[in-house]
């Protein structure tokens, strides 16, 4: 049995953390023993809700990671962010090291201390998983990485798990639009509120669910009051199970400045909800224009597309039919896990 230590440097629970948990819960338990290793804080409820075994780090540094490695004795360390990858590289003589880059972050596209240190450690990685082609190609030191070391692997989710969780929530919801994500950079939540305000001028009784929390929550609340949108927006904060709310919405909106493959968009596809988003890297290949939703960097056009979907049942049915077909290959967890297993072997 192979022992896999999933190493994460933060105590939050967002996209990269969600991917790690998906991998842990979908690996063959007879062949793999997996543990989630990170500082424990905001992520605790999410991990326990998903029955994920974890090793708590009092602080994310070399000495605490060394203790965890000594205790668990992993065959593979799967590091899910830059900081975790750099620390993991120090144990390359003891374990196979997999570095997983989950986003096309702006600070990876230029010379910084982080990109420099990552460049120094890439020789210690057995494999680097990039969430998209442009995440790989945009990395400042990309040309220094050996050709066979990198693999592009788009995120996926288990549609069955999402729908099962949606059915566990017995509350009734009814929303036109849902935003599911952190209220912080690079999600651009203030832009979200501005777009909702534009939509309200055309679709007066619009109801929007905002699920998520973050450092920008207070300024988001101020913007909502300033624009008089209190009757149109419900702020749910973080939810352990947001999937009934998602399934009960007609459209998902994303306003991110950059993304990898956003998990919330995959969750929307699993729930048969069209996606309208800014033209971020990870969605360009998934949300083909007019097939599963719409992409634009113009606020007016984003608002216009959402209102068009809300006002046209025929359009909603057309998108729904397309999404149902696409879900089978976009959210193919079996294929994803097979690739991960090959990387571990």
Tell what function each PLM region has:
Residues 6-61:
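N-terminal strand-loop element at the rim of the active site
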Residues 274-277:
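Short hydrophobic beta-strand element within catalytic cores of glycosyltransferases
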Residues 140-141, 149-174:
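Acidic anion/phosphate-binding donor-loop and adjacent secondary structure
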Residues 14-22, 175, 179-201, 208-210, ...:
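A conserved mid-protein helix/loop that constitutes part of the nucleotide-sugar donor-binding site
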Residues 238, 257:
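Aromatic "clamp/platform" in nucleotide-sugar-dependent glycosyltransferases that forms part
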Residues 15, 314-344:
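A charged, aromatic-enriched C-terminal amphipathic alpha-helix characteristic of glycosyltransferases
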Residues 79-85, 101:
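Short His-centered aromatic/hydrophobic patch
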Residues 289-300, 308-313:
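Conserved acidic donor-binding segment of nucleotide-sugar-dependent glycosyltransferases
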């Amino acid at each position: 049995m192979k022992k896999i230590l999933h190493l994460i440097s933060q105590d939050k629970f967002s996209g990269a953390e969600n991917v790690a948990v998906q991998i842990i819960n979908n690996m063959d338990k007879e062949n793999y023993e997996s543990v989630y290793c990170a500082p424990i804080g905001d992520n605790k409820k999410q991990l326990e809700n998903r029955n994920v075994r974890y090793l708590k780090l009092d602080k994310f540094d070399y000495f605490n990671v060394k203790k965890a490695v000594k205790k668990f004795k992993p065959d593979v360390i799967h590091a899910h962010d830059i900081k975790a990858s750099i620390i993991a590289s120090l144990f390359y003589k003891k374990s196979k090291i997999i570095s997983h880059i989950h986003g096309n972050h702006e600070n990876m596209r230029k010379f910084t201390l982080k990109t420099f240190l990552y460049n120094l450690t890439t020789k210690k990685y057995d494999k680097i998983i990039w969430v998209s082609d442009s995440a790989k190609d945009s990395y400042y030191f990309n040309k220094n990485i050996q050709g066979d070391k990198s693999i592009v692997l788009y995120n996926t989710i288990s549609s069955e798990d999402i729908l099962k969780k949606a059915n566990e929530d017995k509350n009734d919801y009814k929303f036109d639009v849902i935003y599911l994500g952190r209220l912080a950079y690079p999600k651009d939540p203030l832009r979200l509120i501005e777009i909702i305000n534009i939509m309200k001028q055309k679709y007066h009784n619009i109801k929007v669910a905002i699920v998520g929390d973050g450092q920008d929550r207070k300024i988001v609340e101020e913007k909502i009051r300033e624009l008089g949108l209190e009757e149109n927006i419900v702020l749910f904060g973080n939810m352990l199970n947001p999937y009934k709310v998602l399934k009960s919405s007609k459209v998902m909106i994303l306003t991110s400045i950059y993304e990898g493959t956003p998990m919330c968009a995959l969750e929307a596809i699993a729930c048969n909800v069209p996606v309208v988003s800014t033209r971020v890297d990870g969605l360009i290949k998934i949300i083909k224009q007019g097939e599963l939703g719409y992409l634009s960097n113009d606020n007016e056009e984003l608002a216009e597309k959402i209102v068009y979907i809300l006002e046209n049942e025929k359009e909603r049915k057309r998108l729904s039919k397309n999404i149902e077909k696409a879900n089978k290959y976009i959210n193919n967890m079996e294929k994803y896990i097979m690739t991960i297993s090959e990387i571990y072997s």
